Amino acid sequence: MPRSFLVKSKKAHSYHQPRSPGPDYSLRLETVPAPGRAEGGAVSAGESKMEPRERLSPDSQLTEAPDRASASPNSCEGSVCDPCSEFEDFWRPPSPSVSPASEKSLCRSLDEAQPYTLPFKPYAWSGLAGSDLRHLVQSYRQCSALERSAGLSLFCERGSEPGRPAARYGPEQAAGGAGAGQPGRCGVAGGATSAAGLGLYGDFAPAAAGLYERPSTAAGRLYQDHGHELHADKSVGVKVESELLCTRLLLGGGSYKCIKCSKVFSTPHGLEVHVRRSHSGTRPFACEMCGKTFGHAVSLEQHKAVHSQERSFDCKICGKSFKRSSTLSTHLLIHSDTRPYPCQYCGKRFHQKSDMKKHTFIHTGEKPHKCQVCGKAFSQSSNLITHSRKHTGFKPFGCDLCGKGFQRKVDLRRHRETQHGLK
């Protein structure tokens, strides 16, 4: 084999050609003389056996076409020296014969290439078994219920626990009765009387124990049924929270009810004051002039203004003066003809609620105020006070002209009109 052929074939190999071959690339390949049939076949067979594996790239070996053996020996299509191979620029090592123009074109092609992005692969929930999913959901619900019930433990007792005072629970829980130790039973929202509430009455606790109820029977039924129907299948903490919220929403501002008169109060202190003043029969503050007793010192101070002659509250419509601002407010209802309180029996309307209640005793015949001396009963407390002066002989109303005293104010007015000619 001539030396010139080996040199030309070596130069024509892709290892020694630039990345951007010139226009005479195919021309040089065509000028290579083809060997004879017998000689060429032997040479090609020998070269195919002797060709080292290092001269072929890994990509070219993997992407080798199946019909390469059937291709013509002079064809470069699909071979390593094919200039249009898509793997040419990735595996070919740099050559010192690369021109600057070709380097610029190569850099431009790399700059224009799209950035490499990682493919997003969503997590397949189907990979988990059904039991695993149920376990995760149940664990989350239990954690949520515990977090929500943790804040309620500051306000709502859920059962008799060691180390807690018995006064925080109802009487059944404190005495170990039927309601003791029941989980989910709120000592605040329950219908039973709390020991702490009864402790507010002091000496009047035994007498006022039957007058205390929280909440009312109807309202308690509402919130209990509501809580059990909506939250029966939930945890204890959520149930306690729902019952407490339902109690606040349904009962509103007033949730402490007096059983005797059905009056509702928003705080236990208000109920305690009401029981002490109205139903306990004990009024420790007495007026020195008329002997009238009161449950609070503030009420006594307001009452003392009745005995004074000063009238500092004047009506701007008729000019009438009053000793109390509350009396003036009641008087102004007369000028406006506002009677918002009707009688449920006869329909007669009144300015004040107290006047309406006094009027209803006429229809019912009820006389709740009884004299302790003679046993006579009255429908109004004012009539009982006036009657008690007959037994004591006390005459708080005296004439400033003659000094004569009277038990009732109306008797003094009549005396001034008839005896002294004053109106």
Curated annotation (Swiss-Prot):
<dbReference type="GO" id="GO:0010977">
    <property type="term" value="P:negative regulation of neuron projection development"/>
</dbReference>
<dbReference type="GO" id="GO:0007638">
    <property type="term" value="P:mechanosensory behavior"/>
</dbReference>
<dbReference type="GO" id="GO:0009996">
    <property type="term" value="P:negative regulation of cell fate specification"/>
</dbReference>
<dbReference type="GO" id="GO:0045165">
    <property type="term" value="P:cell fate commitment"/>
</dbReference>
<dbReference type="InterPro" id="IPR036236">
    <property type="entry name" value="Znf_C2H2_sf"/>
</dbReference>
<feature type="zinc finger region" description="C2H2-type 1">
    <location>
        <begin position="256"/>
        <end position="279"/>
    </location>
</feature>
<dbReference type="GO" id="GO:0071222">
    <property type="term" value="P:cellular response to lipopolysaccharide"/>
</dbReference>
<protein>
    <recommendedName>
        <fullName>Zinc finger protein Gfi-1</fullName>
    </recommendedName>
</protein>
<keyword id="KW-0804">Transcription</keyword>
<keyword id="KW-0863">Zinc-finger</keyword>
<dbReference type="GO" id="GO:0000122">
    <property type="term" value="P:negative regulation of transcription by RNA polymerase II"/>
</dbReference>
<dbReference type="Pfam" id="PF00096">
    <property type="entry name" value="zf-C2H2"/>
</dbReference>
<dbReference type="GO" id="GO:0042491">
    <property type="term" value="P:inner ear auditory receptor cell differentiation"/>
</dbReference>
<feature type="zinc finger region" description="C2H2-type 6">
    <location>
        <begin position="397"/>
        <end position="420"/>
    </location>
</feature>
<dbReference type="GO" id="GO:0032088">
    <property type="term" value="P:negative regulation of NF-kappaB transcription factor activity"/>
</dbReference>
<comment type="function">
    <text>Transcription repressor essential for hematopoiesis. Functions in a cell-context and development-specific manner. Binds to 5'-TAAATCAC[AT]GCA-3' in the promoter region of a large number of genes. Component of several complexes, including the EHMT2-GFI1-HDAC1, AJUBA-GFI1-HDAC1 and RCOR-GFI-KDM1A-HDAC complexes, that suppress, via histone deacetylase (HDAC) recruitment, a number of genes implicated in multilineage blood cell development. Regulates neutrophil differentiation, promotes proliferation of lymphoid cells, and is required for granulocyte development.</text>
</comment>
<feature type="modified residue" description="Phosphoserine">
    <location>
        <position position="57"/>
    </location>
</feature>
<feature type="zinc finger region" description="C2H2-type 5">
    <location>
        <begin position="369"/>
        <end position="391"/>
    </location>
</feature>
<dbReference type="GO" id="GO:0005654">
    <property type="term" value="C:nucleoplasm"/>
</dbReference>
<dbReference type="GO" id="GO:0003677">
    <property type="term" value="F:DNA binding"/>
</dbReference>
<dbReference type="InterPro" id="IPR013087">
    <property type="entry name" value="Znf_C2H2_type"/>
</dbReference>
<keyword id="KW-0479">Metal-binding</keyword>
<keyword id="KW-0597">Phosphoprotein</keyword>
<feature type="zinc finger region" description="C2H2-type 3">
    <location>
        <begin position="313"/>
        <end position="335"/>
    </location>
</feature>
<dbReference type="GO" id="GO:0042660">
    <property type="term" value="P:positive regulation of cell fate specification"/>
</dbReference>
<feature type="region of interest" description="Required for interaction with RELA">
    <location>
        <begin position="141"/>
        <end position="258"/>
    </location>
</feature>
<dbReference type="GO" id="GO:0042472">
    <property type="term" value="P:inner ear morphogenesis"/>
</dbReference>
<dbReference type="GO" id="GO:0006974">
    <property type="term" value="P:DNA damage response"/>
</dbReference>
<keyword id="KW-0238">DNA-binding</keyword>
<dbReference type="InterPro" id="IPR050717">
    <property type="entry name" value="C2H2-ZF_Transcription_Reg"/>
</dbReference>
<dbReference type="GO" id="GO:0017053">
    <property type="term" value="C:transcription repressor complex"/>
</dbReference>
<feature type="zinc finger region" description="C2H2-type 4">
    <location>
        <begin position="341"/>
        <end position="363"/>
    </location>
</feature>
<feature type="region of interest" description="SNAG domain">
    <location>
        <begin position="1"/>
        <end position="20"/>
    </location>
</feature>
<keyword id="KW-0677">Repeat</keyword>
<feature type="zinc finger region" description="C2H2-type 2">
    <location>
        <begin position="285"/>
        <end position="307"/>
    </location>
</feature>
<keyword id="KW-0539">Nucleus</keyword>
<dbReference type="GO" id="GO:0140767">
    <property type="term" value="F:enzyme-substrate adaptor activity"/>
</dbReference>
<dbReference type="GO" id="GO:0001708">
    <property type="term" value="P:cell fate specification"/>
</dbReference>
<comment type="subunit">
    <text>Interacts (via the zinc-finger domain) with ARIH2; the interaction prevents GFI1 ubiquitination and proteasomal degradation. Forms a complex with EHMT2 and HDAC1 to promote 'Lys-9' dimethylation of H3 (H3K9Me2) and repress expression of target genes. Interacts directly with EHMT2. Interacts with RUNX1T1; the interaction represses HDAC-mediated transcriptional activity. Interacts (via the C-terminal zinc fingers) with ZBTB17; the interaction results in the recruitment of GFI1 to the CDKN1A/p21 and CDKNIB promoters and repression of transcription. Interacts with U2AF1L4.</text>
</comment>
<feature type="compositionally biased region" description="Basic and acidic residues">
    <location>
        <begin position="48"/>
        <end position="57"/>
    </location>
</feature>
<dbReference type="GO" id="GO:0008270">
    <property type="term" value="F:zinc ion binding"/>
</dbReference>
<feature type="region of interest" description="Disordered">
    <location>
        <begin position="1"/>
        <end position="76"/>
    </location>
</feature>
